Amino acid sequence: MRDISEIDKNLKVETTIQKDGLKFYDIKEQPFKVYGVFHDGERYRRMPDDVAKSVSDAIHYGVKYTAGGRVRFRTNSSFVAIHYKGEMGKMPHFAFTGSCGFDLYFGNTYVGSFVPPMGNNKGYESLIDLGDSEMKEVTINFPTYSFVEELYIGLDENAHIEAPTPYKVEKPVVFYGSSITQGGCSSRPGSCYEPYITRRFDCDHINLGFSGSARAEDEMAEYIAGLDMSLFVYDYDHNSPSIEHLTATHERMFKIIREKNPDLPIIMMSRPKYYLDSTEEKRLEIIKKTYENAKAAGDKNVYFIDGRDLCKLCGNEGTVDNCHPTDFGFASMAQTLGDFIEENGLL
């Protein structure tokens, strides 16, 4: 097949990477497969614009962060490069490799990170040499706190490119919650807790974590209720502004989703924190009460995880600021949640 960029120069990707045989491909084209986000003509996003706008201004903005986004494919290229266009989110307590970086996996094995530059905030290029030409199952995880307008994958022009092997569990696990759910403050996107679950159970997932903005609005609950999912996990304790708000919304969100999904496994979690003050303990009891009420009403597919149990591995050493997990904290969350899912046969 002839390279279309030879005919339409607007499709040619300009690059500063010096690599013989380098050719870029738009991930919107076959055989690449994008998960967790979709392109709306301007950028990749996590929810439809009209739905997000109906929830809140903060959600309308936050859906442009590409947390949970992935592109997957198979190739025997001896290198993989990216050419990324977008707006890069950078924060003092958050590694750039996490907030605005992409990382690379072969199957379940981390291979390397496409490290963003210090000075530029409008995208970048990066290349990882692999050293062999074996066929590989590739996953590239999107940044957790950045906007992605376009992403091109650079491969050897003579390499084979194939569609990825489908996930064993194709219906996604849907995660809803706070900045922790979104991925703050992992050192790279693949070390958030949700990708651990995807790798462990070979399942798709959708990240609906919204920094400071997860308030369990009815519009959000209705949107989630309409998704075709294999499992729903929710934890917005940190973002609920008061005990009164949490009381008014937590069970209500559960009931909205349960009404449309009578057989869906639903896991509710309290905030992942090792030590709780008296107010935080009251919040935990509100969340647990939703679970207890559902069980008392005969619900046989509802589950509860005490957020302190999410810290079993890391103890009190799992955050950057006594709130947002480090990679160690996320690994601890993933281990507890993954073991719970496995023990209860939820995937």
Regions of interest found by a model, annotated:
Residues N207-A214:
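Short beta->alpha junction loops
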Residues G86-M88, S179, S211, H238, ...:
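Residue-level signal for short, function-critical loop segments
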Residues S187-Y196, K282-T290:
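Short, solvent-exposed amphipathic alpha-helices that sit
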Residues E194-N207:
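Short helix-loop-beta junction
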Residues M1-P172, E342-L347:
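N-terminal secretory targeting modules
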Residues R2, K64, D218-L347:
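Alpha-helical cap/lid subdomain in secreted, periplasmic
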Residues E170-S191:
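Catalytic nucleophile-elbow at a beta strand-turn-alpha helix junction centered on a G-D-S/GDSL motif
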